[in-house]
């Protein structure tokens, strides 16, 4: 029912934007925003680009860094405007060292829960080889890159008794014209409760936290965000929880599984199109 209401509202809005001659007024956002979802199995990396600008959220495992760098260069990006590391688990920070050594990075945002691991050590060593001072996000941070607005929401505690790394995940909202996307890292129960309490509103796309693992608070998160698409990073060996998939079906949310191949999610500021290699994509009405 909510999706039908969205479609109706969108139709009304678009009708209101038409001139007497039947032509639409100016676009909600100039150009396009693209989210490239790497297919790294149970590891996360998302490249968000607008015209001439690039932001990377997480870097997958150590062996994924080379592929990220290669993709950036193939697409003509010699620098990153910002690197956001949601937390320091190896499947999120692993490729960061390679990225920092190979690509000019202007800004690094990180979580507040460091880990004693070789991946963390390599990341810090690579960071020392640059002139960047990484920012540990402790307050809500909003900034604009190109025509996209990014808001980063930090964990609300300095430490968590259970799953401290995952529950320290940064959450990032990306807004472009009338479209919006929410990335939640590996948030588990304690962090999910915090994100839900923020009452962030609706999003066109929600990244399901922690590779699609089940948590009762996913019900609250989905009903708050009311997405049309839900993105999950998992693997054939460790697939998403069936209870999570059943919930998405129940809420009429289309699941996008990165393990089935890389995804490109493109917004023109009003509609969103999702495609895999060889696909043309299907337009999606923006959230109301």
Where are these regions (language model features)?
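Non-globular, low-confidence helical/coil segments that flank catalytic cores
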Residues: 2-3, 7, 17-288
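Repetitive helical segments and hydrophobic/amphipathic motifs
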Residues: 11-15
């Amino acid at each position: 029912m909510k999706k039908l209401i969205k479609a109706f509202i969108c139709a009304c809005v678009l009708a209101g934007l038409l001139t007497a001659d039947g032509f639409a007024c100016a676009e909600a956002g100039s150009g396009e925003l693209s989210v490239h979802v790497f297919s790294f199995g149970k590891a996360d990396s998302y490249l968000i680009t607008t015209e001439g600008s690039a932001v990377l959220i997480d870097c997958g495992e150590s062996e994924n860094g080379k592929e990220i760098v290669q993709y950036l260069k193939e697409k003509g990006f010699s620098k990153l405007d910002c690197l956001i590391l949601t937390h320091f688990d190896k499947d999120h920070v692993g490729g960061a060292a390679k990225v920092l050594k190979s690509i000019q990075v202007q800004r690094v945002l990180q979580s507040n829960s460091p880990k004693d691991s070789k991946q963390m050590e390599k990341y810090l060593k690579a960071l020392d080889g640059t002139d960047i001072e990484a920012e540990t996000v402790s307050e809500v941070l909003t900034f604009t890159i190109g025509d996209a607005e990014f808001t980063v929401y930090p964990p609300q505690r300095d430490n968590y008794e259970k799953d401290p790394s995952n529950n320290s995940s940064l959450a990032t909202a990306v807004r472009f014209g009338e479209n919006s996307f929410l990335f939640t890292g590996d948030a588990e129960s304690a962090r999910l409760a915090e994100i839900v309490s923020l009452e962030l509103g609706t999003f066109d796309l929600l990244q399901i936290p922690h590779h699609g693992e089940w948590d009762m608070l996913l019900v609250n998160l989905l009903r708050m965000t009311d997405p049309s698409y839900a993105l999950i990073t998992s693997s054939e060996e460790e697939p998403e929880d069936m209870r999570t998939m059943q919930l998405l079906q129940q809420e009429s949310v289309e699941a996008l599984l990165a393990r089935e191949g890389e995804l490109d999610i493109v917004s023109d500021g009003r509609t969103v199109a999702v495609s895999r290699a060889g696909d043309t994509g299907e337009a999606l009405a923006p959230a109301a």
